[in-house]
């Protein structure tokens, strides 16, 4: 079943959840542990309490219900189900076993797990939700629900639901709703209202197709509304052309919003939770510089970020594509920060922003011991800091200024008296080092980016 967009955080709070993961060929034990820890944080963000974890090593997800027969019964014992998959479920053959063989490993059907049910446990205390750390098919979700008696969510559905809960601006809500409907459409057969449709196969299929058509029409309507908003965004971006722009990019909960607040003094939302920020915020670096430097905070990334969400948030991610400098913000205290950085680079590569100049910012250094800090300092082109330390923020601000200063050139400009109205444009986008007057107009000695100089010369010609 897809997660309901109307399920509130309060309704979920206190509900128990079991995490399920299949370790596929090529996935190390360390990678699996990191993925499950991250899934646990995602599930907790939705308000659930994680009480057990069931894992299994397989060549591929079981076609019927994700897990093999024995491990499925173990999971059902935890949730109070019977552990029986409806007959007629298809089997699937894959080439994955060859990968295990090439690695010299054997893929056992069952892997022992410490999470076993308590004898005589009250059904009211049993987990009501199963969360699978893979994107699964509607039939797999249905079979897993029947075998365990619990609601089933997959990783994609969890992320989509978190985005739905945290979207605040109209643009973000439209983007998330498009992604949610794309996720829900193929899962309509799983809806709880399907009993009447099952009376006749033909009638049921017709009803489902009608619902899907309604969803397609709704998506088209939402995309029209989103296009209008994005046109306004593009107009604002066009107005900002020629300005110095820095984009904060990175994994979710890396501390981008905290850095945004520290650099700009703006009261942006700062919360210690995944995907607290979905809306792009643009503010000026403080204290203000001449020319102004604009800082933008962007949506965070995560491993296995659903493609529909990446597509929906493409216009938001374009802030990174159009920036002069990217600050890759990384939570240095997270043991998996190297892998998180690779996820960030991969997403930015997907949108064509891999060649934008960048600076690596290892944040949350206040959580590191001296040895860990010393090890990180050996990295090149890296700043190690804490967004809560004013000295570190000052150092980051200076690094930003130095980046732009290094790209500026010094030139002479003549502003004719007939075009004195352009003086404001010059002062806004360049550093004016000297100003004098003669019979032809105002002569200025300025420092600015080459592109800015070229634009000003064209306007003054």
Whereabouts are the PLM-identified features?
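N-terminal accessory targeting/assembly segments
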Residues: 1-155
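Conserved G1/Walker A P-loop phosphate-binding module
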Residues: 2, 8-17, 27, 191, ...
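Flexible beta-alpha connector loops of hexameric P-loop NTPases
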Residues: 26-31, 60-65, 166-172, 206-207, ...
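Residue-level signature of catalytic and energy-coupling elements of molecular machines
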Residues: 39, 130, 181, 215, ...
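Canonical P-loop GTPase G-domain recognition
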Residues: 147-199, 203, 354-359, 364-417
